[in-house]
Amino acid sequence: MARLEDPTALTQLPDESARVRYTSSELQDYFETLKFPQRFLDLGNSVLKDPSLARTKENGLPLLQAITRYHTCNVPFENLVLHYDPHKIVTLDPAELYTKIVTRRRGGRCMENNIFLGTALRSLGYEVRNCGGRVSRAMSPYPEVRKNQSATYDGWNHMLLLVFLGDEWYGVDVGMGSMGPNLPFPLQDGFESLSIAPREIRIQKRSISETHATGPSHATKMWCYDVCYNPAESKKTWTPVYCFTETEFLPQDYEVMSWFTSTNPRSFFTRYITCTKMIMDEDKEVIIGNLTLFKDTVRETIGSDRKVVKKFETEEERIKGLVEIFDVNLTEEEKNSLPQEKRLA
């Protein structure tokens, strides 16, 4: 983002020569952050030596699948900067995000995680397009919203990536917390896949219910990402998670989106402290659940089973839990910058 104090320093996509790219050494440090096993380190190093391999399904897709899986399990989806940071300002600068995610072992919300990942993928040789989405109100933390407005969507408030492999585009999203797809999905109308068992995901191209169009043929069609929690039922019930477009979004688009979601008092992110990491099985082949901190409680969800892991009584306990459970370390300045009204007793 441009400097806040200078009204003439407007955000834009830099010229090609000025765009941030991570070095081979920085990408190898990112692989270390992901805790890649040797087989994926070898694959990643092969792509580093020959970036053209990144655009093939034979090499690029397995590496992309591994990066997506290991990123969501080792880089948290979190909004701690909005509560503990002394300035409460979210950076979307790729160089600063590298420091935050790789050097400090922190995470971020959708735009932080996906801007960082998009930069890493381009640095590896992938063709990547930044896109935007609207989160479904069926995902709202408020029961009354889910009950009364589940067929509607928020405004543009989400980011995801499209990655071109072989001859088709794949959706990639490491910034949706526990409700993310957790795998690269082909941009195919009607695509369905197992995500976190038993949950299934679906991709459809359809119009959404909110439209001024006078008929279905006039309504704009969006790509819609849905989930089914109980696919064993005789008739599957699909719940919308978000809709998105193939239109390329620019840094100035995300600046507007991030500013709203990080400053609006009605925003989930400004009201509640949250942190999520996904959990892999013992063989590190599939994601089986998640650990999520919401306000003062950490819950573990494995498949359909959910339990409370820890409930914090004091702020000191919550900060200790961030370290022990999520491997998130706050500085003393950050610990002291949480407003008094948000501190646990």
UniProtKB/Swiss-Prot annotation:
Task: Briefly describe its induction.
Answer: Expression is induced in response to 2-benzoxasolinone (BOA) exposure.
List UniProt keywords, sorted A-Z. Acyltransferase, Transferase
Spell out the protein name for this chain: N-malonyltransferase FDB2
Task: Tell me its EC number(s), please.
Answer: 2.3.1.-
What molecular function terms (GO) are annotated for this protein?
arylamine N-acetyltransferase activity
Cited SUPFAM superfamilies: Cysteine proteinases (SSF54001)
Which Cys residues form disulphide pairs? none
Organism lineage reads as: Eukaryota, Fungi, Dikarya, Ascomycota, Pezizomycotina
- Family of the protein in this entry: Belongs to the arylamine N-acetyltransferase family.
This protein's pathway reads: Xenobiotic degradation
Effect of gene knockout: Eliminates the ability to metabolize BOA.
